[in-house]
């Protein structure tokens, strides 16, 4: 009797996977992982931050606080807040890094009684405009001329380039993050123009350094309005317009309508200077955005796509300038378009 072949008795042995096929499978897996990483890098939203609006009016929550706390009173500010060192000074306030219940906080003190009206105006705006776009108020004492706010260690927006040059922040030094900062800035302007306190104009903005000093850079790399001492009201219905200060302004950073219109032959007189509206803030958007975009790979590409809206912002006729909402929507479209283009290129490479 003829013997059956051994392999027929035991069934077919499992086939070995050719090395080339295994390599292709590994490459496919790596491409999938790379795609997911790119998808996260370009599309994932920022880590959310605590919004003070989650607390009732007159309350706050910072850091790891689970519950909202009422604004601190004069007595609490005097006894619970420990002043550490001065970290800033302006015409209206001196700012001190301080400590409250193991939280780093910013204590602002009035510089001189001559500036008290501006100080109280800033306090009123800070109280009334609390929300995602404004630094968190922790307490105040009008008797002592003090205001307590949340402390942000990265400081003023003026420090942006210095901060992004640090090695630990290189991962956020991209055109995507910088364009998002520009969107934050325009969002703040849009909020001020449609605030619960009416249309407010950011008057402390006569040059680039002064403008940047009005805002804070958070550890989450977003922007907050911080100095609200000069936010006059525009009311188009009643014809109420504004003038930013009582001195003659110069340069091309300020809007044309902020310049003395009667030539060098006539000395400046405040009572003859025409007033203006919130469109002066729109004029300044391209210059602020250009600073925020910096000079890194991809920033000129973003500038190119923003050229038309920025040209409109620089219209000599205020009424022809876009609104802050128009600018914000254009920024969002540009961000989406460029992000999709980069993702498409990344997919083609995989």
From Swiss-Prot:
<feature type="modified residue" description="N-acetylmethionine">
    <location>
        <position position="1"/>
    </location>
</feature>
<dbReference type="GO" id="GO:0046835">
    <property type="term" value="P:carbohydrate phosphorylation"/>
</dbReference>
<keyword id="KW-0256">Endoplasmic reticulum</keyword>
<dbReference type="InterPro" id="IPR039318">
    <property type="entry name" value="POMK"/>
</dbReference>
<comment type="similarity">
    <text>Belongs to the protein kinase superfamily. Ser/Thr protein kinase family. STKL subfamily.</text>
</comment>
<dbReference type="GO" id="GO:0016773">
    <property type="term" value="F:phosphotransferase activity, alcohol group as acceptor"/>
</dbReference>
<feature type="topological domain" description="Lumenal">
    <location>
        <begin position="44"/>
        <end position="350"/>
    </location>
</feature>
<dbReference type="InterPro" id="IPR011009">
    <property type="entry name" value="Kinase-like_dom_sf"/>
</dbReference>
<comment type="function">
    <text>Protein O-mannose kinase that specifically mediates phosphorylation at the 6-position of an O-mannose of the trisaccharide (N-acetylgalactosamine (GalNAc)-beta-1,3-N-acetylglucosamine (GlcNAc)-beta-1,4-mannose) to generate phosphorylated O-mannosyl trisaccharide (N-acetylgalactosamine-beta-1,3-N-acetylglucosamine-beta-1,4-(phosphate-6-)mannose). Phosphorylated O-mannosyl trisaccharide is a carbohydrate structure present in alpha-dystroglycan (DAG1), which is required for binding laminin G-like domain-containing extracellular proteins with high affinity.</text>
</comment>
<feature type="glycosylation site" description="N-linked (GlcNAc...) asparagine">
    <location>
        <position position="235"/>
    </location>
</feature>
<feature type="glycosylation site" description="N-linked (GlcNAc...) asparagine">
    <location>
        <position position="165"/>
    </location>
</feature>
<dbReference type="GO" id="GO:0019200">
    <property type="term" value="F:carbohydrate kinase activity"/>
</dbReference>
<keyword id="KW-0547">Nucleotide-binding</keyword>
<keyword id="KW-1133">Transmembrane helix</keyword>
<dbReference type="GO" id="GO:0006493">
    <property type="term" value="P:protein O-linked glycosylation"/>
</dbReference>
<feature type="glycosylation site" description="N-linked (GlcNAc...) asparagine">
    <location>
        <position position="220"/>
    </location>
</feature>
<dbReference type="InterPro" id="IPR000719">
    <property type="entry name" value="Prot_kinase_dom"/>
</dbReference>
<dbReference type="GO" id="GO:0005524">
    <property type="term" value="F:ATP binding"/>
</dbReference>
<keyword id="KW-0472">Membrane</keyword>
<dbReference type="InterPro" id="IPR001245">
    <property type="entry name" value="Ser-Thr/Tyr_kinase_cat_dom"/>
</dbReference>
<keyword id="KW-0812">Transmembrane</keyword>
<feature type="transmembrane region" description="Helical; Signal-anchor for type II membrane protein">
    <location>
        <begin position="21"/>
        <end position="43"/>
    </location>
</feature>
<dbReference type="GO" id="GO:0004672">
    <property type="term" value="F:protein kinase activity"/>
</dbReference>
<feature type="topological domain" description="Cytoplasmic">
    <location>
        <begin position="1"/>
        <end position="20"/>
    </location>
</feature>
<dbReference type="GO" id="GO:0005789">
    <property type="term" value="C:endoplasmic reticulum membrane"/>
</dbReference>
<keyword id="KW-0007">Acetylation</keyword>
<keyword id="KW-0808">Transferase</keyword>
<feature type="domain" description="Protein kinase">
    <location>
        <begin position="81"/>
        <end position="350"/>
    </location>
</feature>
<keyword id="KW-0418">Kinase</keyword>
<keyword id="KW-0325">Glycoprotein</keyword>
<keyword id="KW-0735">Signal-anchor</keyword>
<dbReference type="Pfam" id="PF07714">
    <property type="entry name" value="PK_Tyr_Ser-Thr"/>
</dbReference>
<keyword id="KW-0067">ATP-binding</keyword>
<protein>
    <recommendedName>
        <fullName>Protein O-mannose kinase</fullName>
        <ecNumber>2.7.1.183</ecNumber>
    </recommendedName>
</protein>
């Amino acid at each position: 009797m003829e013997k059956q072949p051994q392999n027929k008795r035991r069934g077919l042995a499992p086939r070995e996977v050719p090395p080339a096929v295994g390599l292709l499978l590994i490459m496919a897996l790596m491409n999938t992982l790379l795609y997911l990483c790119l998808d996260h890098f370009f599309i994932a939203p920022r880590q959310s931050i605590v919004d003070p609006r989650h607390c009732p009016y007159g309350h706050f929550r910072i850091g790891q606080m689970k519950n909202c706390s009422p604004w601190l009173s004069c007595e609490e500010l005097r006894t619970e807040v420990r002043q550490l060192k001065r970290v800033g000074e302006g015409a209206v306030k001196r700012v001190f890094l301080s400590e409250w219940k193991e939280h780093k906080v910013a204590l602002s003190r009035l510089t001189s009684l001559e500036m008290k009206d501006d100080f109280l105006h800033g306090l009123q705006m800070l109280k009334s405009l609390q929300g995602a776009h404004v630094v968190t108020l922790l307490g105040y004492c009008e008797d002592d001329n003090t205001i307590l706010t949340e402390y942000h260690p990265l400081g003023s927006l003026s420090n942006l380039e210095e901060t992004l040059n640090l090695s630990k922040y290189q991962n956020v030094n991209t055109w995507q993050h910088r364009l998002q900062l520009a969107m934050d800035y325009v969002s703040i302007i849009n909020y001020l123009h449609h605030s619960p306190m009416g249309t407010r104009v950011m008057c402390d903005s006569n040059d680039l350094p002064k403008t940047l000093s009005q805002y804070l850079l958070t550890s989450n790399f977003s922007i907050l309005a911080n100095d609200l001492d000069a936010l006059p009201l525009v009311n188009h219905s009643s014809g109420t317009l504004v003038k930013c200060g009582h001195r003659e302004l110069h340069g091309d950073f300020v809007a044309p309508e902020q310049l003395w219109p009667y030539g060098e032959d006539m000395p400046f007189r405040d009572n003859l200077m025409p007033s203006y509206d919130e469109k002066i803030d729109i004029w300044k958007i391209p210059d602020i955005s250009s600073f925020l975009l910096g000079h890194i790979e991809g920033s000129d590409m973003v500038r190119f796509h923003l050229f038309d809206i920025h040209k409109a912002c620089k219209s000599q006729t205020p009424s022809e300038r876009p609104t802050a909402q128009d600018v914000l929507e254009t920024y969002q479209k540009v961000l989406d378009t460029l992000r999709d283009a980069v993702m498409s290129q990344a997919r083609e490479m995989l």
